[in-house]
Amino acid sequence: MSSLPTSDGFNHQAHPSGQRPEIGSPPSLAHSVSASVCPFKPSDPDSIEPKAVKAVKALKASAEFQITFERKEQLPLQDPSDCASSADNAPANQTPAIPLQNSLKEAIVADNLEKSAEGSTQGLKSHLHTRQEASLSVTTTRMQEPQRLIGEKGWHPEYQDPSQVNGLQQHEEPRNEQHEVVQQNAPHDPEHLCNTGDLELLGERQQNQPKSVGLETAVRGDRPQQDVDLPGTEKNILPYGCFGCSSSETFMEIDTVEQSLVAVLNSAGGQNTSVRNISASDLTVDNPLMEVETLKCNPSSEFLSNPTSTQNLQLPESSVEMSGTNKEYGNHPSSLSLCGTCQPSVESAEESCSSITAALKELHELLVISSKPALENTSEEVTCRSEIVTEGQTDVKDLSERWTQSEHLTAAQNEQCSQVSFYQATSVSVKTEELTDTSTDAGTEDVENITSSGPGDGLLVDKENVPRSRESVNESSLVTLDSAKTSNQPHCTLGVEISPGLLAGEEGALNQTSEQTESLSSSFILVKDLGQGTQNPVTNRPETRENVCPEAAGLRQEFEPPTSHPSSSPSFLAPLIFPAADIDRILRAGFTLQEALGALHRVGGNADLALLVLLAKNIVVPT
């Protein structure tokens, strides 16, 4: 390969025309704008000049840039056609990364360099840190040049189509030399583009401070020794066309002392490198986005497909938002993506009692809890049907309603909760024996271990001796009442059911009256003979039996009044009359009238939720 000597005494590598120096670089990284440095490894550590000499060269280069700008900033902007023609006149065999040698501007610089080198370098400092023992050279950023726009002002590298960038890479010409972005002041290796352990910090520049091509050409001509080969990821996004100049933002003072050097441990090579932090003075508040990417360069010019994220990167205090580049540069999971705002909080689950989702969720939780063995294995779970006849002294009519065994006091009890309060029982364990002898005179079942609290836990239930299919009683940590499964013999069953939660087999997750049932969780029910002249142990009033529900009355058999259960405080239960259409709808779904009435009572007349309760009874949670 040929080398082109420059005024700084170093031979810069010359690439053939059309050849890209970033061999192996992923095309998707071409959107990045170089905002920092790419260190290079010198081929011979002995060729590195002493630090003092390099510092002098850096100061002289700064002086050249300032002098050139002061001379050229008053010049009119160059026409785009002039820019294109001057760029097209570049030699065809010169690499796109090497600036044009302008002898006229070099003479101007040489004439003025010694006169104002010391006075014009104030505010522009550059410190070169050299590690000769490790053969690593970390170059510092010369200046943060204003953002350039391609063609028109609306161009932004983030929104540019990848196909346009690919076309730019394929048809790039030597005039790219006049639009290089990064100025570097350290020698580079003609044989190696980048060191293995070096990282390159890429970021967006300001978009609203363009610079004229005339000034750019002047700067390139005055300081050819400061221009080095750039990776394709920096070069391919360089704009064409004419640029404006902002005199107020001419120089962005770069004080490398204020810039933080972030030490990044290279996991592949194990070498410590330094990446340059973007100074706060290089960013303005109106710059909404800054893409930060680090690229790992190796001697074989192969770039790491996943950019290494710099964890210790310190950002300026201005409102700069770091955005991920997965969409722009392909799927790079290591891309640095920092958000200025925290993630939105997760919405809380809907606590509405009428929500089917909440009902199913509650059902699942209760079934999982109830699957734990908390009680002795009971024999069978059946459905209780109760007829509550509460005859008021004024206008309370005789009523008969059916209740499933585990149903709670619902809206009917809500109306009377000011008179009677049912408190949650802590523990009720009811174990009943199944009566197989059809000649049992009383037909009662033994009720054991009844421990409940609250004034309303002693109510009785009227149970129908209809055989029920066996359900999973091992899942239930609550009370299950066993009915005598005799054919024609009436039996009296006394039982107290406690539902601290919901009964596993039958309780759907219906919390429509969850607030009420928390304080009314002890299920009432009443087993009594509805014969004439019998006294209700709950209300202590005489009561008569009327056929309020004809179908239920047809199936009802007389039960002997219980003698072992004490009477509790009075309870006035106002019934709910449900629409026939809702009952028919549940019956058409394959459920019995008893189940339909019980479910409607439980959910306060909501047919949808009642149907859901009945369907949820069939859910079995595997243990």
UniProtKB/Swiss-Prot annotation:
Residues 577-617 form the UBA domain. Keywords: Cell membrane, Golgi apparatus, Membrane, Nucleus, Transcription, Transcription regulation. Residues 1-16, 83-99, 133-144, 474-491 have a biased composition (Polar residues). Renal outer cortex and outer medulla, small intestine and liver. It comes from the Eukaryota. Residues 1-48, 71-99, 116-189, 433-493 are annotated as: Disordered. It is found in: Cell membrane; Nucleus; Golgi apparatus, trans-Golgi network. Residues 150-159, 170-180, 460-473 have a biased composition (Basic and acidic residues). Disulfide bonds: none annotated. PROSITE patterns: UBA (PS50030). One of its GO terms (cellular component) is nucleus. Mediates transcriptional and post-transcriptional regulation of SLC5A1. Inhibits a dynamin and PKC-dependent exocytotic pathway of SLC5A1. Also involved in transcriptional regulation of SLC22A2. Exhibits glucose-dependent, short-term inhibition of SLC5A1 and SLC22A2 by inhibiting the release of vesicles from the trans-Golgi network. Interacts with YRDC. This is Regulatory solute carrier protein family 1 member 1. It comes from Sus scrofa (Pig). The gene is RSC1A1.
